[in-house]
């Protein structure tokens, strides 16, 4: 599968300011595959170490010395391969299992930066970011997310359709034939989500029920991660928070309420569990603001927030949503339809925020009178973004927001075509990844 992030790796490879790269992201988003393919396509050879698969590697290679010259000699002997600066990519995978290997990146940067070293790991935010062993300032940190809808189109060989929505030069409706086709494919993406194994299953079988089975396998692997890596006293709480998310989002008021998990539960019972899931890159936390001024972080109410899963396909799987209902619709599906679409939007916006300092997701409320699903910042301006899962054009909350703050432009994302009506821009859900370009 082609990943847009390959471009970032190519920039890293040729950058004069290159540091060792740490690639973070949830488990099974494709970090290992991406780095191995990048090595094959762009280097003469590669050295690959998996510290989870072979627990001896950490003590054996890094136990005595973190001197890069010593480490290079050890790697040459151990793997029986030559290592040439700039021509060999060294990959430390599951690096969270070897703090010494992670710490060695500092010395590669300071003493041997001519060597190209990438480290990848899951749960790095949980295990290592707050420890002394993390080489802050000595590495380039990047994030890999599930495949977005544009990457999905490439995977299913719909590149011509992708060109129709990537190469627009004016804000005008997409040709209706293309729009209808894109909506149909978008519904499939709502089921598959962006996990590579789920999409690969769809490519091989075109069977959405087998996709759900693959997603169940991924979810089961996450439960094993909870038990293996989380503090023992937090494991059950993490599972309870994780499993409560569909119930939280199906409410009319989607804010996270602790008593949904357990009657009488309070914030201090589950704060650590929520933070663990955030740092594991498994959920997106969306904060409430009552005033949409810059910087948005200054107007956050930290006690009021929503939680979205990081992948819309896994959300549908854990909620038990039947693929047939998503494709064809059903009266009983109405309530979940909104939460599924909002989860997709959160996934897109979360990825667009990648690498931004203290970037968060935000939504706006006004004393119970109105609520706008998301508030985004672009070029020092703030825009409200309403999410519609159906074709209804009602936007009372956007109207309240526009009147209150005299907004020149408000945004809606929905299954409707691209258009601007008055001060409202409607962005088709399938085109949301282009939102910054459209605003510019």
Indicate where each model-derived feature is located.
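Short glycine-rich substrate-engagement loop in P-loop NTPases that contacts/grips substrate
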Residues: 55-85
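Hydrophobic positions on the alpha1 helix immediately C-terminal to the Walker A/P-loop
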Residues: 34, 38
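Interdomain motor-coupling "hinge/lid" segment immediately C-terminal to the ATP-binding subdomain
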Residues: 128-250
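Structural recognition of the conserved hydrophobic beta-strand(s) that form the central parallel beta-sheet
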Residues: 91, 116-122, 143
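N-terminal pre-Walker A segment at the start of P-loop NTPase domains
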Residues: 1-14
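Conserved lysine of the Walker
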Residues: 31
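Hydrophobic anchor at the beta1->P-loop junction of P-loop NTPases
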Residues: 23
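Accessory nucleic acid-recognition modules appended to NTPase machines
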Residues: 200-376
């Amino acid at each position: 599968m082609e990943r847009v992030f390959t471009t970032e790796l190519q920039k890293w490879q040729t950058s004069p300011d290159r540091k060792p790269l740490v690639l973070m992201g949830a488990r099974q988003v494709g970090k290992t595959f991406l780095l191995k393919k990048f090595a094959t396509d762009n280097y003469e050879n590669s050295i690959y170490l998996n510290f989870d698969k072979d627990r001896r590697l950490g003590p054996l290679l890094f136990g005595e010395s973190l001197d890069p010259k010593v480490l290079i000699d050890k790697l040459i002997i151990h793997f029986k391969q030559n290592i040439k600066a700039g021509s060999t990519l060294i990959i430390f995978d599951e690096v969270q299992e070897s703090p010494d290997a992670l710490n060695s990146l500092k010395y590669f940067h300071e003493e041997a930066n001519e060597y190209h070293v990438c480290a990848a790991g899951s749960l790095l935010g949980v295990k290592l970011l707050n420890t002394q062993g993390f080489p802050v300032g000595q590495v380039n940190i990047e994030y890999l997310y599930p495949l977005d809808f544009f990457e999905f189109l490439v995977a299913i060989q719909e590149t011509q359709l992708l060109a129709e929505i990537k190469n627009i030069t004016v804000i005008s409706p997409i040709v209706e034939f293309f729009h209808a086709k894109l909506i149909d494919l978008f519904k499939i993406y709502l089921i598959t989500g962006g996990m590579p194994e789920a999409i690969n299953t769809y490519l091989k079988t075109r069977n959405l029920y087998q996709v759900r089975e693959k997603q169940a396998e991924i979810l089961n692997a996450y439960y094993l991660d909870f038990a293996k890596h989380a503090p023992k006293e937090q494991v059950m709480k993490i599972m309870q928070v994780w499993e409560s998310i569909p119930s939280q989002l199906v409410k009319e008021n989607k804010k996270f309420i602790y008593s949904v998990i357990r009657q009488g539960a309070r914030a201090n019972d589950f704060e650590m569990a929520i933070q663990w899931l955030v740092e594991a890159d498994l959920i997106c936390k969306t904060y409430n603001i009552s005033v949409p001024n810059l910087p948005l972080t200054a107007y956050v109410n930290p006690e009021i927030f929503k939680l979205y899963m990081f992948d819309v396909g896994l959300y549908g799987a854990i909620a038990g949503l039947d693929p047939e209902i998503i494709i064809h619709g059903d009266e009983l599906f109405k309530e979940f339809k909104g939460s599924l679409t909002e989860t997709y939007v959160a996934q897109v916006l979360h990825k667009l925020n990648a690498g931004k300092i203290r970037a968060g997701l935000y939504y706006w409320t006004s004393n119970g009178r109105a609520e706008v699903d998301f508030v985004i910042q672009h070029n020092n301006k703030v825009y409200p973004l309403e999410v519609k899962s159906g074709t209804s054009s009602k936007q009372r909350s956007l109207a309240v927001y526009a009147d209150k703050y005299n907004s020149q432009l408000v945004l809606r994302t929905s299954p409707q075509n691209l258009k601007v009506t008055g001060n409202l821009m409607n962005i088709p859900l399938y085109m949301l990844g282009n939102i910054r370009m459209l605003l510019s």
